[in-house]
Every structure is written in structure tokens, then in C-alpha cells.
Amino acid sequence: MKLNPAMWRKALQIIPHVSKEEWQALDILSRWLIATRAAVLIMTFLSAVLAGIFAFRAGLFDFWAWLLVALGLVLAHATNNLLNDYTDFVRGVDKDNYYRAQYGPQPLVHGLLTKRGLLTYAAVTGAAALLTGLALVLMKGPMVLLLLAAGAFFVLFYTWPLKYIALGEIAVLVVWGPLMIGGGYYTITGAWDWNVVLASLPYALGVTGVIFGKHIDKFEMDKERRIHTLPVVLGEKLSRGIVVGMFVLQYLLTFYLVAVGFYTPVMAGVILAFPSLYRILPLFRLPKPAEKPAGFPDVWPNYFVAAGFYHNRSFGIVFILLLIVDTVLKLVAG
């Protein structure tokens, strides 16, 4: 079986649709990247990058600890995606052309993997994540074990029951901000910093907005299946407004951290990402259309989630580039 670097790149950029015949011809890494929805793992990797930059900014960067943090977080997220697909399949959620099976291959629904095969992927990936976590415990001390336990809790219980009882979106905010970035910073440096936790929220709000958008996109489907995501509980219209509010709050929190002196004034440059938010605002004024709009990118049925991802990518790139400049200025100034 030949290695397929072209598919590796594709699977890291989008969630590719593949037939059963195409799947059988793929190498094991390509299959793993598709099954774990590797294109979305970039959000987790960027959280690890931010934790590393904050550690470097504080003069406490440890490359090997950061590398294990990044690897462990990505593997944990991949494990969660696999368990998500398994849980939804055995609970009957993904049948009847459910949203998840429309935007990319669901390994069980599309017959790419057996239940045993998917659980094997999850077990191996989860074991690798656990091993990196245990290595960090040995390197950095027992307090890291608490962060490892918290991460394991969310990996195992996000899909059920948290997502079903309107706690999934809150879990995402906690995980991608305080836990991944704040906890990652602590694991790398050995010091807890509440300013770093606060500084993690602009990025975490973007990720949460993307998840919120996905849950609005499948509002009717989740409502029928009694999956009580926050949009189902709060209503579709209010949820659209909350997503926009979260995106605006990303900028306001960054400006606040500039005002109190945690950041240098260069971080106010995140306003350069605002045109991407302005561009998607019209989409959030009305409910999701029944059919794909003319000229809409080829990501349907992703609609609000696609808009959120577009803004989050723009904000994230600008935020990280400015944070690097901010870090250099901070270190030069002493």
C-alpha cells in the first residue's frame, strides 16, 4: 500500500469525501486523518501554540514539554472525534442522512470501518494521548495529573451526556481556553497565571463560536432527536446573536488586556481581522436557508459553522502573528 502525501495534505485542509473503494486503497495514516477529521485538529494545535508563546513570553519556555503538550492535546481531540462518531452511531443519531454524515465521511455510517475497527482507532489514539500525558506528569509533577484527569473527562463525556444537556458549548469554551492554553502554560512553565487564562478566552470564544454555529446549522435535526444543545435550549434566533456577541467579545477582551498592560499596544492590531467579521454578519441576520445559496462555497450543509470558521481563521492568524510581535517587544524591553 503506497503512502499518499497528497491525501494527507487534503485531509489536513478539508474533510474529504471518499468512497469505500477509495478508502480501501488509502494508507493507514490517510485513513486515520480522515476518520479523526484532522482538518479541525488545527484549532487544538493553535491552542498549544498559544500556550507555548505565552510561556516563551514569560521566559519559561521548555521545548520538549511544549512538544508533548501539543501532541497530547491533538491526540486527545482526535480521540474525542472518534468516540463522538461511535457514540452517535450506536445511539442512532447519525442515521437518516443526519448532518454529521452529510459534511464528511462518518466511518460507521458509510461502511468505512466496523465498530470494532473504529474503537481500535480510538483506543490506540487515546492510549498515545494518555502516554504523552503521563510523560508530562513524570516531567512536571503530580499537579499535571489534575489537568490530565480534566482532559480525560471531557474527551469521554463531551458527546454524551454533556452535549445532550446544553453543556457541550460551555465545555468547549473551558477546554480550548483555560484548560488547553492556561493548563498548557502551567504544564510548560510550572506556574499558573490567571492573566494567561484570561488571555486564552479570545481564542476560545472563536472556537466556541464555530461549535455554536455548527449546532445552529443542525438545530432542527438535534431538536427532533432530543439533543439539547444550547441553540436548541435558547432558540435559533437568540443563538445567532450570541455567536456574533462572542466574536465581538474576542476583540473587546484583547483591547482590555492592552489597556491593563498585559499586552503591548501592538495587540490592538487585531482590529485588522474585523473585516472578516463584518463580511459574515449578514448571514447571521436571518435563519439558515433551506437550500445552498448561489455562489456559496462548496461546504454545504455547513453554513453558520463555515462563516464562524472563516472569521476564526482570520482572527486566529492575526492574533498569533501580533502575539509573536508583542512577545518580541516585551522581551526586548526587558
What are the functions of these language-model segments?
Residues 1-64, 68, 165-168:
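Topogenic membrane-insertion module of multi-pass membrane proteins
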Residues 42, 46-50, 171-185, 203, ...:
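Small-residue-rich segments of transmembrane alpha-helices in multi-pass membrane proteins
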Residues 49-50, 58-86, 145-156, 193-213:
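Membrane-embedded alpha-helical segments that form the functional core of polytopic membrane enzymes
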Residues 75-100, 208-231, 236-238:
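Acidic (Asp/Glu-rich) catalytic motifs at the cytosolic membrane interface
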Residues 97-138, 227-265, 306-318:
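Multi-pass membrane catalytic core of lipid/isoprenoid biosynthesis enzymes
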Residues 104-192:
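Intramembrane alpha-helical segments
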Residues 172-225, 240:
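Functional transmembrane core segments of multi-pass inner-membrane proteins
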Residues 259-332:
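Extended hydrophobic alpha-helices typical of membrane-associated regions
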